[in-house]
Structure formats: structure tokens, C-alpha cells
Amino acid sequence: WIINEAIKLEKNVINLYNSYSYHKAVQNIHNFCVNELGGIYLDIVKDRLYTCSADSQARRSCQTSLDVLLNILIRLIAPVLSYTAEEIWQLSSNLINQEKSVFLSKFSSRKNTKDTKISSLEWDRIFEIKDSVNQSIEEMRNNNELKGSLDAIVNIEVNTDDFLILD
């Protein structure tokens, strides 16, 4: 999901740069980092990064996604945050297909987002369910019934359609 969202962002930002709408490009990058990346994805995967063993598939999958995201975001910020982008590029020696400088690299030539088994409407429903669960957990934490979200045991009752999405 997050990589598809980043690919959509990349296409949109490149179009905005090509039309000299730099302020809109920066706004789109900022909104992605705040909403999708910080507000959803990192919140979901942070526990996986902290608790899974270093060689677990769940953790490695997350690290690979973060590497792809970093690669996309560095290229997108380079036209407006030149020194910052170059410094990150130089310090990130493990980036995929890394040139000597971010300015020698090209924007991606991805034509389409990757096909996924889950539609955007289904993702919206998943996030609605996630928000409902998080709200319940937060209420339990406020009532001192729970120390943290990792202590929660969650049972979700859903209809058939939601079950098929969550399965």
C-alpha cells in the first residue's frame, strides 16, 4: 500500500515540477510524509521494527519498503532541498541503484502503480476498522485497563464483506 501511494505521489510531484508548481509539489510531499507515512504507515510498522528479530521476514519486508520510500522521497525533495537531499544520499550508501549523486540519478520511469489484491476502497475500510480498534485501545489506556497497545488482545466482529477484506 505505502509503496503504491509513494508511486502516485512521485507521478504527481513530477507533473507539478514540470509545470513549475514547486509550492504545490512541496505541499504534496509534506502531506504525504505527515498523513500517509507518519500518520498511518510508520504507526503500523513501528512495533514490527522494535519487536521482530533482525532476520524476520516481517522486519525485512518493512525495511525494504522503507528503503524504497527513502529512494523515492530523496529524489522528490532534491529540486527544492538540494543540500539536504545530497547529504542524505551520501549517507545512505545502501540505496537501490545509487549513483554518485542524487543529481545524477533520474526520477523513476514507473508507468503504473503495482497491482495489488486490495482496492483503494478496501484499504479505506481497513483503515476505518484500524481507527476503531485504536480508539477502543486508547479508551482502555485512559481508563488504566491497558499499559500499551502491545498488551491488547483484539477480537473483531465483522460482517462477511469486512471479513473477506481482512482475511
Question: What is each PLM-predicted segment?
Answer:
Residues 26-30:
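Aromatic-lined ligand-binding clefts that engage carbohydrates, nucleic acids, or primary amines
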Residues 17-24:
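Short helix-adjacent coil turns
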Residues 1-11, 43-136, 143, 148-160, ...:
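Acidic, turn-prone loop/beta-hairpin segments
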